[in-house]
Structures are given as structure tokens and as C-alpha cells.
Amino acid sequence: MLETTKNLALSVYFMLPSCVPATGLDESGAVLEAEQLRPYYQQPRVLGLAELMNSYGTVRADEKILQKICDCTAAGKRIDGHAPFLSGEELNAYIAAGVQSDHECSELHEAMEKLRRGQYIMVREGTAAQNMESLLPLFREPYCSRCMLVTDDKHPGDLLQGGHIDYIIRKAIAAGVDPVVAVRMGTLVPCQYFGLAHSGAVAPGYTADLIVLSDLEQFTVEQVYKNGKLVAQQGRMLHPAALTVDKARFARVFDSFNMDEITPEQLQLKQTGTRQRVICLTPHALLTTEKIVPFCQHPGTAPGVDVAQKIVKLAVFERHHRSGHVGLGFLGNYGLQCGAVASSIAHDSHNLIVAGTNDADMVLAGNTVRKNKGGLAFALNGQVVGELPLTVAGLMSTESAETVEEKLQALKAALKAHGISEDIDAFMTLAFVSLPVIPKLRLNTYGIVDVDAQRIVPAVF
């Protein structure tokens, strides 16, 4: 990625992955220790250590985590945080370890506590996680000098239609924020935070990376300059970069699925009991809640599924080492009334996640993604209704953003027609259900994870 982004009409910087796997209760395709990361700090476009999501291990002085922090600090680079709802003494310990920012704040009191303790706050407004409205009081002095704008995950269609940071600035201005403050939070503050001393402002001695706007209300970008040269106008690149794909050199990336075909037997619940634990989604957020309900069985659906109560079955299949590990659980508020959805985008280990109302469609959707070596799929009544192959590591496509968006919208439309909740993104929200560092419950290949306690809890009991 460093190599292929060298000569673009865009400055691309990187933060090193700090937690692969996210915690000890996760199963990833690789394990990245401090020694593997250390050489990359010499790269000028590597700005530091990315979101330190294992806050549980950090505050308990995990030696491997502390070594990564020490290496990054010694290189004079930034350490980003990821610590939803961390507070009090544990937050103090986390910050004292060297973590300098956080992008997981969904409530104002949480952001204020972290600001008071010296962290920068990244105000997130993406596809699934939308926190700007809750954090609007930060868009003024004295807070705005320590706050910046970020998107986290965002669908290609949202980027094409609304934009990236410019979309958040536009939305903030519409909410009454001073345009100068909004622009500052989207440009100067992040450059100051990441140590990009000659970027982020139109001033003597600064790199001539700038945009020309229609006005400060609509905030329509009319021209883009890179190093003083006009590179885009009226929403189009003047000289688009040619896409080259060396499949021989990156064969491992294009063949990232190492798992056997899914069978119905893998979806059979091993646990028994009279109650079931449901991972309940939260509208426009990544947080989940826990709900305990009587174990349900209805004709035509898998045991534990109750479409009237918006409860579907959930499975995560390990896809990197052919271990055969499968975690099973139940997902609430997803809304799907029939069929099954599968995705190889499943943060952060990106195993294969499948949600559905019946085992047969779950098997079909999962095997469709496996056959395509990654991507998304929707199966209904034994037929594949739609699919989007993502052949680059099971996460990305070599097709244009426009082509990917067209296929994605067709999939999402089909899912909306079959019950997906209006305030839930069918794929983006699902992709975070397996990340065992955002409260309250997650599902990975080991089972349901209680994030706060960092332990596996039963789905049925």
C-alpha cells in the first residue's frame, strides 16, 4: 500500500495496525507484534500507531502492547486511541500509557472527560456511526482546537454522493457551526495533531494543497490543487491514475480464503437451555446492548429466530487457517424477515459473518462469498438474489467505485425490501458485530464476547 500510493494526486499517510488480533479473544489471519511493526516507523508517510483498541490490555500493562507503545513513542510519532466509555482511573492509565486521541465518543460527557485529560477528540460521522450531532457543543472554543473530523468506515456511494470530510463540514455548517471553525477542524487541527507541519493551511511556507469553494454555505468543491497544480475540477479528476493489478506478485491477497465449504451441521447449536442471549444493534451507532429472552422456536425459521421480534441467527466462520471454528449467536434489531446475508468484511479479523432466518440460506450465502473469494451476498429461498465480489483480501474490489456502488445499492435495495431496519446499514453495521472491543456484546469465531468482561458467554442457557 505504501508503494502503490506514492505518486498519486493525493497525500496518503498510514497508521500502523496496533492490535492484530484485536484482543486475545479473537482469531485473525496474522499476528503482528512490535518487531514486525518497528521497521515501518522509518517511513515518512507512517505517522504512528493506529487506534489502540485493546484498552483492556493496555490499562493492565500487557507487555506486548506496551512494547508497541514504547517503539512508537521513541520514533516521535502519534498513538491513536479506541476506548468507548473508558473512564476514571482506567482512562487515566490508558492516557498515561501514551494514547493521544479517541474517535469512539458517542456522548458529550465522554468526550469532555477525555478532553480534560488531554486527549484530542476525533468527531466521527460515517455510514454506520454518526456522532456529530451529539458532539456539536465541541464545535466552538475552547474545544475546537483539540477536535478534528473523521469518518471511520464509509460506503463508496456515500463518498461519491456526499463526499468525505467536506460532507461533515457541510453538515456542521447546516447545523449552525461557524464555517471557519468547521474548516479548521477538518484541515488545520488534524495536520497539527499528526505533525504535518507544512500542511493544513493556506499560508506562506505551507504546501499548496488546497481547494476552491463555491461559498461557505453549500461548500461545493469546484477545484482541487495538489502541490500548486490543478488536479480536479467540478468533481472530476483531470488525470485519473491508471489502475494496475499484479496478481502474480500479490497472489496471497487475491486468494485469501482458506476454509472448507460451509455445511448445515456447522450451524447446529451445541448449547441447550430455556433462554437466549441477543446482541441488539443500536440505530446509527456501533454500540450494542444485551437482551435476554425466552428461547424461541417457530416453523420455517432456525431455532432461536423470531422475525416478529427482529431476532435473527448469527454465525462467524474462521476463514484464514482452515480451523473450522464457528461462533453462533443471535442478532437483534437487524430486521431481516427472510433469507440470509453474508460478508467477508467483519472487523477486524475479517472472518466470514452470516446473519439469517434459516440455516439453508445462511449456508448458501456464506458459500457464495467463499466461492467469490470474498465479498457480500444475499440468499433467499435457496437462490442467490445478489452478490458483490471483493477479491482483494475479501475486502476490496479492482472495479471502479461507481461499479461497486451500483452493485452495493442493488443488494441494499433487495435487503430493504425484505425487512432490514431503516436506521441500520445492512452491511456496515453487520461488519462491526464481530469486533470484540466495542461494548456490549460481539460475536466472533469463539462465540459471544462480553466486551467489558473480556470473556465468552453462552448464546443459549
What do the predicted segments below correspond to?
Residues 1-76, 142, 385-388:
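Divalent-metal coordination cores built from histidine and acidic residues
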Residues 6, 41-42, 73, 95, ...:
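Alpha-helix boundary recognition
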Residues 11-13, 80, 148, 377:
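A structural signal for isolated positions on well-ordered beta-strands in alpha/beta enzyme cores
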Residues 14, 149, 355-358:
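Residue-level marker for buried hydrophobic side chains located in beta-strands
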Residues 16, 83, 318:
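Short beta-strand/turn micro-motifs composed of small residues
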Residues 47-186, 191-201, 210-215, 220-234, ...:
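Active-site core of metal-dependent hydrolases
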Residues 160-176, 180-461:
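Active-site microenvironment of metallo-dependent hydrolases
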